[in-house]
Swiss-Prot record:
Family, as annotated: Belongs to the complex I subunit 2 family.
Cellular localisation: Cell inner membrane
Source organism, top-level taxon: Bacteria
Keywords carried by this UniProt record: Cell inner membrane, Cell membrane, Membrane, NAD, Quinone, Translocase, Transmembrane, Transmembrane helix, Transport
Assembly behavior: NDH-1 is composed of 14 different subunits. Subunits NuoA, H, J, K, L, M, N constitute the membrane sector of the complex.
Transmembrane segments: 25-45, 61-81, 99-119, 149-169, 193-213, 257-277, 285-305, 312-332, 355-375, 391-411, 432-452
Naturally occurring in which organism (per UniProt): Flavobacterium psychrophilum (strain ATCC 49511 / DSM 21280 / CIP 103535 / JIP02/86)
Protein name per the record: NADH-quinone oxidoreductase subunit N
Broadest EC class assigned to this enzyme: translocase
InterPro entries on file: NADH-Q_OxRdtase_suN/2 (IPR010096), ND/Mrp_TM (IPR001750)
BP GO annotations: ATP synthesis coupled electron transport
Pfam families referenced in this protein's UniProt entry, alphabetically: Proton_antipo_M (PF00361)
């Protein structure tokens, strides 16, 4: 609970910095504040409890995922200084919004009451609507903001309807009371209908098939840093929340729900990777890649043991690789209307360090050994084999092979084609973020138990 309070206070401090004309200090102060909050959050790992009549719950799940969210936010805030260099008068707004977005993320994995869950998801969603349309002079950004707002509002409405049905069936928003009632009596059909509505709404937020159609256009039109936020932080927050909802509200999974999860996972893996093969725009490609990774993460709901730790590890590997990827993409595609693969031509010769980092990030997402992306998929598929979901394992392997095709399109462009443009000097912060993210990615691959043993 204190973590959420400190994050909210830091967001207010970021906004106040503008009043005192301390724009240059906003990013450093925010990063230091986030690192301090990260340390405090870790200290709560073994101090479990609930607050405000169980509105907020501190447990190992919430602490572990909140720590991951804080780390990703540190990277995003660090990238903000250079990305918003031409909009210095608004940097406090953008940084403040990212911090408030983090507060919504923490609330979404720490809730003990469905009303707090909905409050968290709205704080996160509204922050993203603003960031998606933040480039007011760009029509694509305006379009992305409007599409994301409409689709997000639709998903929020479905989630709220599901919560209402659950409340109508149980008479409570409190998860503990709902769980006690589930174990002591049979529920009317609308309780399970409410769970299905919750599932549909969260799948919209995660962008899985068949609720994915908004993602490519929104990712392409949004500013690159906002796309990075959506595809890393927002996606893993929604996935962690979905996991908590399903495991708490359905302590014994129904076979019909499992079939829905299997169909969504398989369709997302296949369609995401097949559609990514056809893309020439890097952000659209990453949108479809994210859909396929969402399919992998959704399949953790089928596991009977070590599901939470597997999801945490996969989310960590995916998000950190995504940060390294976008640190390079933001530099290469700066001031370009279209972020095509041709923009990366010759990067291996002109900027070998960035090319190497981008290559490693892409290989990690493809599931190539040594990097953490490989171990994330390996641990997940190994657990799926034990639960006898062999069809999901087979499709996951096929889709991983397909993904190599479009990831290598970028790698080939970097190392085999000549550059058609002269790029400016690489901002130091982009290099630092990319290098640190890559080091964390490799460390996760070499020492997976550090994360796997947290849950």
């Amino acid at each position: 609970m204190n973590t959420l309070i400190y994050i909210s206070a830091l967001g207010i401090l970021s906004l106040l910095a503008e009043i005192f004309n301390a724009r240059k200090a906003i990013v450093p102060i925010t990063i230091i504040g986030l690192l301090a909050i990260f340390g405090f959050n870790i200290s709560e790992y073994n101090h479990l409890g609930s607050y405000y009549n169980n509105m907020m719950v501190v447990d190992k799940f919430s602490v572990a995922f909140s720590s991951l969210f804080i780390i990703i936010t540190v990277f995003l805030v660090a990238l903000s200084h250079e990305f918003y260099k031409e909009q210095k008068t608004k940097i406090s707004d953008y940084v403040g919004i990212k911090v408030f977005l983090l507060s919504g993320a923490v609330a979404m994995v720490s809730f003990g009451n469905l009303s707090m869950f909905f409050l968290g998801i709205e704080v996160l969603s509204i922050s993203l609507y603003i960031l998606a349309a933040s480039n007011r002079l760009n029509l694509k950004s305006n379009e992305a903001g409007m599409k994301y707002f409409l689709m997000g509002s639709f998903a929020s409405g479905i989630i709220l309807f599901g919560i209402c049905l659950i409340y109508g069936a149980t008479g409570s928003f409190d998860l503990n009371k709902i769980l006690i009632l589930i174990n002591t009596q049979a529920y009317p059909q609308w309780y399970y209908i409410g769970i299905v509505f919750l599932l549909i709404g969260m799948l919209f937020k995660i962008a899985t098939v068949p609720f994915h159609f908004w993602a490519p256009d929104v990712y392409e039109g949004s500013p690159a840093l906002t796309t990075a936020t959506m595809s890393t932080l927002a996606k893993i927050v929604a996935m962690a929340t979905l996991y908590k909802l399903v495991t708490v509200l359905l302590p014994i999974q129904l076979y019909s729900i499992q079939i829905i999860i299997v169909c969504v996972a398989i369709a997302s893996m296949l369609l995401g990777n097949i559609m990514a093969l056809r893309q020439n725009n890097v952000k659209r490609m990453f949108a479809f890649s994210g859909i396929s990774h969402a399919g992998f993460m959704v399949s953790t709901l089928l596991l009977t043991s070590n599901a939470a730790s597997t999801l945490l590890y996969y989310a960590s590997a995916y998000a950190i690789a995504g940060i390294a990827f976008f640190a390079v993409v933001m530099y290469v595609t700066k001031d370009k209307e279209n972020e095509t693969i041709n923009s990366f031509n010759g990067l291996g010769k002109t900027h070998p360090l960035l090319a190497g980092i981008l290559t490693a990030a892409l290989l990690s997402m493809a599931g190539i050994p040594v990097l953490s992306g490989f171990f994330a998929k390996f641990f997940l598929l190994n657990q799926l084999v034990y639960t006898d979901w062999l069809i999901v394992v087979f499709v996951a392997i096929i889709s991983s092979i397909i993904s190599v095709g479009y990831y290598f399109k970028i790698i080939i462009a970097m190392y085999t084609k000549e550059s058609e443009q002269t790029l400016p000097n690489v901002p130091v912060m982009y290099q630092i973020v990319a290098v640190v993210a890559l080091i964390l990615n490799i460390a996760l691959g070499l020492f997976p138990n550090v994360v796997l043993k947290l849950l």
